Amino acid sequence: MDAFRLAPCGPLRGRLRVPGDKSVTHRGLMLLALAEGEGRLFYPLKAGDTLSTARVLQALGAEVREEGPHFLVRGRGLRFKEPEDVLDCGNAGTLMRLLLGLLAGQEGLFAVLTGDASLRRRPMGRVVAPLRAMGARVDGREEGERAPLAVRGAPLRGLRYTLPVPSAQVKSALLLAGLFAEGVTEVEEPTPTRDHTERLFRHFGLPLEVEGRRVRTWRTGPFPAKDLVVPGDFSSAAFFLVAALVTPGSEVVVEGVGLNPTRTGLLTVLKAMGADLEWRVLEGEAGEPVGWVRARHSLLKGVAVDPGLIPLMVDEVPVLAAAAAWAEGETYIPGLSELRVKESDRVRAIAENLRALGVEVEEGPDWLRIRGGGVRPGRVRPFHDHRIAMAFAVVGLPVGVEVEEPHWAEISYPGFFQDLLRLCAAS
């Protein structure tokens, strides 16, 4: 489909459940593939990125089978088989970076990792360099900075490493490698990042110590598979919450959504902007808090965002920009250097699309300044990025918008546009 046209939408009304959390699905599949025996991943995300993870793990000898909405995984007991072909990670940066950690200590195993054009442009040196310091043998384009990447499993030694910039993916890759290393592997973060890997280590009984911003692990022995329930993805829920906030008369409740505090920085910022939001944690699944969030239309005001919150909402910056476009006054969002190297250059993509909708925006090397007050109808480009496609469907919803190449939303949210239209129709 060339473009998806959303007519101006009246109030959004209703309740919904969003697909399973992408981060938890990736990590859950990987750990089940490492485990001994059989385990189920209930209500995972089944979309472009996570299906790439399933295919890669199958190529490494794990049995991954779909059972209705679930995955059944029979693990390899810490030892993967050497793949017969190149491992294609598609568009999934999380998969490629975590896989480097997973394979680095598989002694004697050889694998080549590649991905689509977008993934082959993304920086991998931030993972490769500390893995090499552990003894990993990894090579690739630009001295290992870009895929394709070749990995030859080797004996690893523990490492004490301080992340130069906050990155849950680098932290997770090193923790996974640490399961195969001699001695302790310790990662220190400059600021907290999402902690799904740590929670899943506890779920599976893997070695883990957390002390402030330091996380430690060490070599593990075989461990049994355990079933895992995946919560709804807060990053997917965020689009509907902001859609309700900016569309007059709206009230939307997202149920069964993950409310991990290392993921919900957006709620803090939206509340500071004057958003009418309520949420409650009802239960926990595999150490992950789960609950509901209600959003009602609100008259938002611009704010200066605390840069310390950005690692807790790094995937929600595009939809925060959508809220800022409708807010009264100026919103300043700093600390965005990581967004330059996501699926797209998200800082540039946000700025260009906001301008296309008549919003005044300034773009710096690692910041955005958005002068809100509303948008005009227009046509927006996803830049091959799922979160840009969905965020700009939301920002244009009250006035009407055309989204080019809407299929990019399928990377993380199959059925996104159908769910959006259903809530519009419910009013």
Curated annotation (Swiss-Prot):
Query: Where is this gene product found?
Result: Cytoplasm
According to its UniProt record, this protein's enzyme class is transferase
Catalytic residues, chain numbering: 315
Q: Which organism is it from?
A: Thermus thermophilus (strain ATCC BAA-163 / DSM 7039 / HB27)
What are the entry keywords? Amino-acid biosynthesis, Aromatic amino acid biosynthesis, Cytoplasm, Transferase
- Give a yes or no for keyword RNA-binding in this entry: no
Q: Which stretches are transmembrane?
A: none
**Molecular function via GO:** 3-phosphoshikimate 1-carboxyvinyltransferase activity
Q: Which InterPro entries match?
A: Enolpyruvate_Tfrase_dom, Enolpyruvate_Tfrase_sf, EPSP_synthase, EPSP_synthase_CS, RNA3'P_cycl/enolpyr_Trfase_a/b
* Record-stated family: Belongs to the EPSP synthase family.
Q: Where does phosphoenolpyruvate bind?
A: 22, 93, 122, 169, 346, 387
The protein's annotated pathway: Metabolic intermediate biosynthesis; chorismate biosynthesis; chorismate from D-erythrose 4-phosphate and phosphoenolpyruvate: step 6/7
Among the GO biological process terms of this entry, one is: amino acid biosynthetic process
* SUPFAM superfamilies documented for this protein: EPT/RTPC-like (SSF55205)
The cellular component terms of Gene Ontology attached to this UniProt record, alphabetical and capped at eight, are:
cytoplasm
Q: How does it assemble?
A: Monomer.
Xref: Pfam families: EPSP_synthase
Q: What does this protein do?
A: Catalyzes the transfer of the enolpyruvyl moiety of phosphoenolpyruvate (PEP) to the 5-hydroxyl of shikimate-3-phosphate (S3P) to produce enolpyruvyl shikimate-3-phosphate and inorganic phosphate.
What EC number is given for this enzyme?
2.5.1.19
Put simply, this protein is called 3-phosphoshikimate 1-carboxyvinyltransferase
Q: Where does 3-phosphoshikimate bind?
A: 22-23, 27, 167, 169, 315, 342
**Keyword Nucleus appears in the UniProt entry:** no
Please write the reaction equations for the catalytic activity of this protein.
3-phosphoshikimate + phosphoenolpyruvate = 5-O-(1-carboxyvinyl)-3-phosphoshikimate + phosphate
